[in-house]
A protein has these predicted regions:
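Active-site-adjacent "subsite" loops/lids of carbohydrate-active enzymes
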Residues: 72-74, 78-93, 171-221, 302
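Glycine-rich, aromatic-flanked loop segments that form ligand/cofactor-binding clefts
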Residues: 76, 111-119, 149-195, 232-234
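Catalytic domains of carbohydrate-active enzymes, especially glycoside hydrolases
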Residues: 98-122
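Aromatic-lined substrate-binding rim segments of carbohydrate-active enzymes
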Residues: 120-168, 264-270
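Aromatic- and acidic-residue-enriched segments that line the glycan-binding/catalytic groove
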Residues: 126-138, 172-198, 236-255
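Aromatic-lined carbohydrate-recognition surfaces of secreted/lumenal glycan-active proteins
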Residues: 165-169, 232, 263-297
Length: 307
């Protein structure tokens, strides 16, 4: 089997505002990095699935037709939750103007792909059955901004000839006090038995089959409702190497694998399930683990070499 990796120009986005609205969205070149770690996961590499089949709900229809696939060389810009903090969500028209400026500037730099951060903290920049609206939209998690930001992002990206991939942090629910308050619809409160704690945050339990299914179903929801060109995970997998993070789940599993191998298996199971969910809709699925294989394997239990 083949491992596909691509290089991309990594560019930061920042907004410079004055009274009366946004003056201009600048894209500052932070540097050119090789995305040796941008991997398209091949199911045969991962082997037979041990993940349960998709649940009966939701009932899904065919996905909207995405824009033409990007050229083989991916020249991508990351638009992260940090950029959304400087974007105007006060109305659809205001957000559309900001989004259009961002996409126009990205296209003018010769990029062809946008990784748009649409689910950073177990909350979403779109209406979802699985996750509340992001606190980034209104300042309050779970509060409807009155429009669909992701729909606007897809439209404005495609208008500039850009492909748009929905960038997701699969496990992270809260980190270093962000968001400051979780709403009642957060998975952390709806499913407390799915949650693991560190000193600085809350994370979905990678070992939970229910969590894996939930995340795969949320991928199907995205692919059903939006003409996105890809699903993109970054390098936030296991947040700690501490044995007590999931000692109870490990003991309950009865696994004969070492703790490290068991954790890697859990991440592989999620990758396999989400890959299958996206590819059922002919939507690309990619992962950008950190740049060293040892850091991936031993620090976050993501077996990028296997992928």
């Amino acid at each position: 089997q083949h491992l596909f990796s691509f290089s991309a120009h990594m560019l930061g986005c920042m907004a410079n505002r004055q009274r009366g609205g946004i003056m201009r969205i600048f894209l500052s070149t932070l540097g050119v990095f090789f995305l040796m770690s941008f991997l398209f996961i091949m199911p045969a590499v991962l082997g037979p699935s041990t993940t349960p089949q998709p649940s009966a709900s939701p009932v899904l229809s065919a996905a909207p037709t995405p824009s033409p696939a990007a050229a083989q060389e991916i020249r991508a810009v990351w638009v992260s939750f940090l950029e959304w903090q400087h974007t105007d969500f006060s109305s659809e028209s205001a957000f559309r103007a900001d989004a259009a400026a961002i996409m126009q500037n990205i296209a003018s730099l010769g990029a062809n792909t946008v990784f748009a951060h649409v689910r950073p903290f177990g909350d979403a920049l779109y209406p979802s059955r699985y996750f509340p609206f992001s606190h980034l939209c209104t300042g309050t998690q779970g509060q409807d901004p009155g429009f669909d930001p992701l729909a606007v992002l897809v439209e404005t990206a495609h208008a500039q000839g850009l492909t748009l991939e929905a960038w997701i942090n699969p496990y992270r629910l809260q980190a270093n006090g962000t968001p400051a308050e979780l709403c009642a619809q957060s998975p952390a409160l709806l499913h407390p038995n799915w949650v693991k704690h560190t000193a600085t945050g809350l994370y979905l339990d990678p070992a939970s089959i229910e969590v894996q299914q939930y995340l795969a179903d949320s991928i199907r929801e995205l692919c059903t409702n939006y003409a996105i060109d890809g699903i993109h995970f970054d390098d936030y997998f296991y947040p700690t190497t501490a044995p007590d993070f999931d000692a109870d789940s490990y003991a309950a599993s009865g696994s004969t694998l070492s703790l490290a191998d068991w954790r890697r298996q859990n991440v592989n199971d999620l990758m396999r399930a989400c890959y299958a969910a996206a590819h059922a809709f002919n939507v690309r699925f990619g992962v950008s683990p950190q740049g060293t294989l040892s850091g991936c394997r031993d620090g976050q239990y993501s077996d990028a070499a296997l992928w």
